[in-house]
């Protein structure tokens, strides 16, 4: 029965809403308010339940004081005769408070505690997936993931602290004030004095804790980013024997983090000591005042018991308030830190009226394109290029000539400052990004695989592919000969073996063959090859070239290679220099022209451009 009740509360909120998330607004409260869309009703319900809990607890203290007076006045028989209805009513209230407390706990713990941060992580993660490549070039991947995880928890704790703790405390103190006035208004004096002193303590120390928490969140993000950076590039670290250097590099960020920890703990100790002192003052002053009022005949023993019990309750509450306040501002610091990243708008977005790209022929046009990574240094300046349907074009030029930039602009990883790029007459700015990239297959020299199984990496090209289609793609990519012999630390073998982060368990050639298999399985009408066979040895390259040739049939192809022999057979070669087309034609035509292409060809050593040519 209880499991069904728990399940009902647990299923009130969907942790994975299907609606597309919107970028949260800047500003602490605007950020939080826009992040909790879809959960506000349950948060409000929790606040209402908390109000009831605070009222019932204060009423219970008042009743216990009254009961003390009754016990000193009535005999047991007379007490039951005259006050039985009140005793039964209070017993009923206690039973109701149990159910009420269960509802408050169920809403808090079952409905909100776990689902709240997961829902935020789901939305934040999808927002980060929509960021451009330039965003990730400026950020540590580990730092971004840490902010997604930590900010979600911090938003939850901030909201629930306000809805639970602060609402409870506010209602409890208001109700207690009413009860104390009913006993004797003088009892308010020590409580008001305590509130003023405690408020001054919090006002003085909590802002300092907040600033320290902000510095600590920044230091934690930097520390996490540096550590993750070392792990992500562990091969480079070991290759240059810089383990100690990386440890020292991370240690500096750890030391900065510890400075913030010590500062935070000093403030915490001061806050704890001052709070304890004010609590002692409240308890003593309430007891002494109660005795004085009792001596003067103004109150009974029950009133003293009620006031003293409330003072002791405040004693316990104050430590809860103190640490929850400290945690609140620590969480606010974390939210502020994460907000700087999570509120960054997407720089490349689909237009509201964007339609899916329809590729029927595969004609590509670059019309008057001007683009620069640095606005002061244009890379492409009024660039024009038309690639006919089904044409195979090779891009050639020194490093920095703009070859990869042309590919990135076609994929809309970046957007040109001027001009337009069209595919079959459709401006890439006017089509949906996902549909654009679904129609393009890309193999690059920097092949990154997901830290998943070989199967998952290959079918990434076409998730609905059958196992037979996946294996056929692996065979065509000359990958089927080594995949059956792969294994991982969990005992998984072959296509089920995991390849490690970025495919680190595989050789460069193996990674590239799996990447080629993935693109072969995708079978997109437009194919981009950016040094697609650079990591393959000559024997494997010869074996795979036939499959690549077959894959290129009836497709529009743009290929980039420093090994000119691999693209010499293309329909047309485009020679770039400083973002401009300086030569174009077939291999034979360009050699006869005796220009830059001929110079690069003559400088080749072993099929690659030599350093002097670069």
From Swiss-Prot:
Gene3D superfamilies: ABC transporter type 1, transmembrane domain (1.20.1560.10), P-loop containing nucleotide triphosphate hydrolases (3.40.50.300). It comes from Haemophilus influenzae (strain ATCC 51907 / DSM 11121 / KW20 / Rd). The chain crosses the membrane at residues 41-61, 87-107, 157-177, 178-198. Belongs to the ABC transporter superfamily. This is Uncharacterized ABC transporter ATP-binding protein HI_1051. SUPFAM superfamilies: ABC transporter transmembrane region, P-loop containing nucleoside triphosphate hydrolases. Residues 364-603 form the ABC transporter domain. Residues 43-330 form the ABC transmembrane type-1 domain. GO terms for biological process: transmembrane transport. It is found in: Cell membrane. GO terms for molecular function: ABC-type transporter activity; ATP binding; ATP hydrolysis activity; ATPase-coupled lipid transmembrane transporter activity.
């Amino acid at each position: 029965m209880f499991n069904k009740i728990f399940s009902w509360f647990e299923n009130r909120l969907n942790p994975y809403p299907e609606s597309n998330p919107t970028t949260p607004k800047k500003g602490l409260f605007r950020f939080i308010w826009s992040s909790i869309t879809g959960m506000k009703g349950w948060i409000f319900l929790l606040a209402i339940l908390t109000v009831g809990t605070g009222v019932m607890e204060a009423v219970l203290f008042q009743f216990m004081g009254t009961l003390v007076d009754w016990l000193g006045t009535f005999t047991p028989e007379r007490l039951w005769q005259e006050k039985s209805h009140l005793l039964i009513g209070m017993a009923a209230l206690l039973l109701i408070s149990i159910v009420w407390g269960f509802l408050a706990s169920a809403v808090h713990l079952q409905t909100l505690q776990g689902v709240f941060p997961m829902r935020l992580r789901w939305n934040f993660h999808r927002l980060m997936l929509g960021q451009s490549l330039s965003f990730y070039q400026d950020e540590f991947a580990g730092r971004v993931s840490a902010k997604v995880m930590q900010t979600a928890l911090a938003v939850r704790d901030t909201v629930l602290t306000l809805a639970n703790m602060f609402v409870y405390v506010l209602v409890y103190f208001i109700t207690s004030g009413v009860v104390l006035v009913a006993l004797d208004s003088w009892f308010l004096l020590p409580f008001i004095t305590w509130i003023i002193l405690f408020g001054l303590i919090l006002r003085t120390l909590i802002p300092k804790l907040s600033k320290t928490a902000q510095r600590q969140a920044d230091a934690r993000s930097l520390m996490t980013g540096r550590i993750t950076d070392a792990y992500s590039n562990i091969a480079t670290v070991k290759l240059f024997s810089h383990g100690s250097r990386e440890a020292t590099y991370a240690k500096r960020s750890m030391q900065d983090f510890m400075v913030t920890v010590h500062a935070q703990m000093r403030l915490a100790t001061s806050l704890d000591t001052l709070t304890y002192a004010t609590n002692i003052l409240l308890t003593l002053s309430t007891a002494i005042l109660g005795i004085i009022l009792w001596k003067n005949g103004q109150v009974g023993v029950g009133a003293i018991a009620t006031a003293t019990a409330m003072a002791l309750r405040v004693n316990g509450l104050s430590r809860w308030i103190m640490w929850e306040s400290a945690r609140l501002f620590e969480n606010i610091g974390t939210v502020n830190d994460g907000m700087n990243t999570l509120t960054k708008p997407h720089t490349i977005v689909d237009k509201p009226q964007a339609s899916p790209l329809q590729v029927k022929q595969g004609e590509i046009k670059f019309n008057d394109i001007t683009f620069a990574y640095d606005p002061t240094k244009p890379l492409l300046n009024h660039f024009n290029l038309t690639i006919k349907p089904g044409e195979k074009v090779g891009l050639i030029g020194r490093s920095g000539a703009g070859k990869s930039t042309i590919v990135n602009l076609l994929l809309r990883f970046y957007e040109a400052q001027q001009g337009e790029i069209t595919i079959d007459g459709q401006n890439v700015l006017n089509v949906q990004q996902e549909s654009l990239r679904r129609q393009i297959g890309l193999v690059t020299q920097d092949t990154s695989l997901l830290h998943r199984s070989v199967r998952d990496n290959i079918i990434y090209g076409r998730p609905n592919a059958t196992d037979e289609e996946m294996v056929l793609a692996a065979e065509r990519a000359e990958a089927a000969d080594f995949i059956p012999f792969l294994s991982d630390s969990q005992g998984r073998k072959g296509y089920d073996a995991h390849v490690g982060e970025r495919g680190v368990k595989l050789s460069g050639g193996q990674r590239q063959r799996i990447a080629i298999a993935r693109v072969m399985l995708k079978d997109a009408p437009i194919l981009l090859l950016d040094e697609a066979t650079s990591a393959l040895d000559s024997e494997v390259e010869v074996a795979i070239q036939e499959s690549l040739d077959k894959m290129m049939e009836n497709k529009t192809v743009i290929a980039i290679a420093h090994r000119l022999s691999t693209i010499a057979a293309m329909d047309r070669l485009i020679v770039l220099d400083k973002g401009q087309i300086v030569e174009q034609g077939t291999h034979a035509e360009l050699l006869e022209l005796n220009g830059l292409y001929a110079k690069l060809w003559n400088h080749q050593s072993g099929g690659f451009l030599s350093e002097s040519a670069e």
